[in-house]
């Protein structure tokens, strides 16, 4: 009976450890909360960075940030992988002007739930600001070249 309990609990540990790993990210991409992420230290304009992310496959976009935990993960990813130490890093948040109002939308189509915006300027694109260790979002000119972070849901 003792061996059965020991074997059963051992199998349970193996099962539980594997159950959280139901997806894999490609080489050089990092997993977090059911998505794959990669920081690119190749400065591009916002629209070009978004196009590049979409070409990475599987519905890729510039990063959308939905929680403080994800913001912390992305900030660490930038620190670990973008060595040029730029003032800003592109993210997938844009102001969308529609007639008399302006709304913010992620390039992946998701709604803006978590916000950490510094309201200093009124540009159309957003970047993560170096001054705040890439945790605050700032309006910046879409035509400037900056490194960027891509995100996509993995293939299961």
Curated annotation (Swiss-Prot):
Expressed by the venom gland. Keywords: Disulfide bond, Hemostasis impairing toxin, Secreted, Signal, Toxin. This is Snaclec 2. Interferes with one step of hemostasis (modulation of platelet aggregation, or coagulation cascade, for example). InterPro entries: C-type_lectin-like (IPR001304), C-type_lectin-like/link_sf (IPR016186), C-type_lectin/snaclec_domain (IPR050111), CTDL_fold (IPR016187). One of its GO terms (cellular component) is extracellular region. Gene3D superfamilies: Mannose-Binding Protein A, subunit A. Disulfide bonds join 25-36, 53-150, 125-142. Heterodimer; disulfide-linked. It is found in: Secreted. Residues 32-151 form the C-type lectin domain. Residues 1-21 form the signal peptide. SMART domains: CLECT. SUPFAM superfamilies: C-type lectin-like (SSF56436). GO terms for molecular function: toxin activity. Its main location: secreted. Belongs to the snaclec family. It comes from Bitis gabonica.
């Amino acid at each position: 009976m003792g061996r059965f309990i020991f074997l059963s609990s051992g199998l349970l540990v193996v099962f539980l450890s594997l159950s959280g790993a139901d997806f894999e990210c490609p080489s050089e991409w990092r997993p977090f909360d059911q998505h794959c992420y990669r920081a690119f230290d190749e400065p591009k304009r916002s629209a070009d960075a978004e196009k590049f992310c979409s070409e990475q496959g599987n519905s890729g976009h510039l990063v959308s940030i939905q929680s403080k935990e994800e913001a912390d993960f992305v900030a660490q990813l930038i620190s670990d992988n973008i060595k040029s130490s730029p003032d800003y890093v592109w993210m997938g948040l844009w102001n969308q002007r529609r007639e008399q109002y302006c709304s913010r939308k992620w390039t992946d189509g998701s709604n803006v739930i978590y916000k950490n915006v510094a309201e200093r300027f009124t540009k159309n694109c957003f970047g993560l600001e170096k001054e705040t260790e890439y945790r605050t979002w700032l309006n910046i000119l879409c035509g400037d070249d900056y490194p960027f972070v891509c995100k996509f849901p993995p293939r299961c």
